[in-house]
């Protein structure tokens, strides 16, 4: 049975939480000042899951793909910048995720779409349409379909999204949903089987492993005062290497990312806290912000409001986020 949902957001935590409810997980930091606006459309005719998403401010995220899903993604505007695990999503290219892929992504103000399908359905469709089963690649990589084939994918994906938003009752028809789904699966299989793979330099995945070690260390130590030497030791990388990789994968220095990450975790805690039982001081110090005056000034500069105002706000999403914000739920 088909279903769809379209939502808009002004809170990045609520936006990432909504993505996390659709066979993926993402969380991270907004990397620039300004008013955050985002939207997320989720459409599932039956087995295929489509996501249409966009945000107005640059972001750096750490995301994971549901291990049960074979997923691809593409940008919808060639002028924007998107990097997936350090790979630039160039115009008219498709990112094909390995099973249970996870890594850092960075976005300019941008829009992206994704198509996901259970692995067994992709294998079956491959056998039916091209005479061989298709499986997820061992490593996430980019492919470049022919311009007509890529255009076909984009237009079909867009048509399904527009129909789901404007006339969901039409897509609710089993016959209509099945027709769209079969067309989507067919063009997805064509892209996977007929496109040219974009070569990735061999050291790239060693660099991804360095960044994963860094993220794991930061996740395990949210309330510690950390220094660059700590980050280098945890990532098993030299100062120079870590700085270079952070600029490639995160778009910023390691210390800037650490600071932004802690600021966003503090903001998340303020958003879900009970103002009658919790103080700004308690939350700030729990994330190793010991100079409260500097914290308040930096917080207001980054988020456009003092931390006390955030504490008084009701959560945008009524479902509180529990557990680690950087891990895919079981």
Could you tell me what each predicted segment is?
Residues 1-35, 81-222, 227-229, 233-239, ...:
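Alpha-helical bundle regulatory/interaction domains
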Residues 33-36, 44, 48-65:
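Conserved short histidine dyad/triad with adjacent acidic residue
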Residues 42, 50-52, 72, 94-96, ...:
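Conserved hydrophobic/aromatic beta-strand scaffold that supports enzyme active sites
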Residues 56, 75-77, 118:
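Solvent-exposed residues in well-ordered beta-strands and their adjoining turns
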Residues 64-80:
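Short, conserved beta-strand element in jelly-roll/cupin
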Residues 65, 207, 259:
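Short, conserved glycine- and acidic-residue-centered signature motifs
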Residues 242, 246, 294-295, 299:
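Short hydrophobic/aromatic patch on the recognition helix
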Residues 250, 258, 262-267, 300-303:
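C-terminal flanking helix
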């Amino acid at each position: 049975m088909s279903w769809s949902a379209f939502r808009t957001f002004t809170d990045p935590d609520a936006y990432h939480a909504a993505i996390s409810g659709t066979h993926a997980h993402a969380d991270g930091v907004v990397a620039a000042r300004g008013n955050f606006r985002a939207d997320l459309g989720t459409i599932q005719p039956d087995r295929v899951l489509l996501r249409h998403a966009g945000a107005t401010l640059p972001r750096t995220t750490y995301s994971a793909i549901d291990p049960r899903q074979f997923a691809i993604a593409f940008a919808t505007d060639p002028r924007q910048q998107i990097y997936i695990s350090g790979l630039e999503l160039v115009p008219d290219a498709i990112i094909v995720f390995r099973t249970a892929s996870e890594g850092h992504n960075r976005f300019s103000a941008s829009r992206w779409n994704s198509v996901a399908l259970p692995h067994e359905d992709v294998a079956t469709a491959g056998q039916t349409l091209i005479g061989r089963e298709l499986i997820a690649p061992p490593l996430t990589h980019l492919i470049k379909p022919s311009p007509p084939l890529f255009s076909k994918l984009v237009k079909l994906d867009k048509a399904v999204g527009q129909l789901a938003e404007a006339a969901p009752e039409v897509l609710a028809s089993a016959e209509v949903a099945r027709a769209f789904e079969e067309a989507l699966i067919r063009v997805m299989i064509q892209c996977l089987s007929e496109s040219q793979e974009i070569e990735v330099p061999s050291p790239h995945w060693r660099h991804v492993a360095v960044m994963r070690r860094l993220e794991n260390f930061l996740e395990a130590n949210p309330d510690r005062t950390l220094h660059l030497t700590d980050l280098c030791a945890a990532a098993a990388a030299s100062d120079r290497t870590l700085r270079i990789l952070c600029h490639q994968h995160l778009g910023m220095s390691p210390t800037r990312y650490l600071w932004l990450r802690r600021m966003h975790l503090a903001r998340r805690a303020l958003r879900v806290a009970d103002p009658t039982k919790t103080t700004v001081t308690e939350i700030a110090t729990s994330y190793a912000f010991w100079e409260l005056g500097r914290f308040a000034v930096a917080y207001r500069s980054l988020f456009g409001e003092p931390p006390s105002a955030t504490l008084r706000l009701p959560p945008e999403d009524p479902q509180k986020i529990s557990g680690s914000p950087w891990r895919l739920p079981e």
